[in-house]
């Protein structure tokens, strides 16, 4: 299985900050990297597919970058509604494994 290592596991940022979340795969993913946002009591929402392509309706404050084994989700600027847990997922090989998640909170 492909192992997905996501950092940091938790993050506190101020409104308006630029936030970056990293994901590293144990082998080359080509373009098969997705990012999800999950809020408490809700199913995960697909934000970004194929590394950098935004799903319809996702604001362009969100962006994805990277290639090969190293990928980044960036939120700029952070807004209150962005408080959630974020996951990367690879779809290069089955099983389609996830990173451990990053819980993003607002620094008050």
Curated annotation (Swiss-Prot):
According to the record, the residues making up region (Framework-3) are: 57-88
Q: For the region Framework-1, what residue ranges are annotated?
A: 1-23
Q: Which superkingdom does the taxonomy of this entry point to?
A: Eukaryota
Q: For this chain's UniProt record, which GO biological process terms are given?
A: adaptive immune response; immune response
Q: Name one Pfam family in it.
A: V-set
Q: Which GO terms describe its cellular component?
A: immunoglobulin complex
Q: Where are the annotated segments for Complementarity-determining-2? A: 50-56
Q: Which Gene3D superfamilies does the entry mention?
A: Immunoglobulins
Cystines in this chain: 23-88
InterPro entries per UniProt:
Ig-like_dom (IPR007110), Ig-like_dom_sf (IPR036179), Ig-like_fold (IPR013783), Ig_sub (IPR003599), Ig_V-set (IPR013106), IgV_Light_Chain (IPR050150)
Q: Which stretches of sequence are listed as region Framework-4? A: 98-108
What are the boundaries of the region Complementarity-determining-3? 89-97
Q: Give the span(s) annotated as Framework-2.
A: 35-49
**Which keywords does the record carry?**
Adaptive immunity, Disulfide bond, Immunity, Immunoglobulin
Q: Which SUPFAM superfamilies match?
A: Immunoglobulin
User: Protein name, please?
Assistant: Ig kappa chain V-V regions
């Amino acid at each position: 299985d492909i192992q997905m290592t996501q950092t940091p596991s938790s993050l506190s940022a101020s409104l308006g900050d630029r936030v970056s979340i990293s994901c590293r795969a144990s082998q080359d993913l080509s373009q098969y990297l997705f990012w999800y946002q999950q809020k408490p009591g809700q199913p995960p929402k697909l934000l970004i597919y194929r590394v950098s392509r935004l799903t319809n309706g996702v604001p362009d404050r969100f962006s994805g970058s990277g290639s090969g084994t190293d990928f980044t989700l960036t939120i700029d600027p952070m807004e209150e509604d962005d408080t959630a847990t974020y996951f990367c997922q690879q779809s290069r090989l089955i099983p389609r494994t996830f990173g451990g998640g990053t819980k993003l909170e607002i620094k008050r």
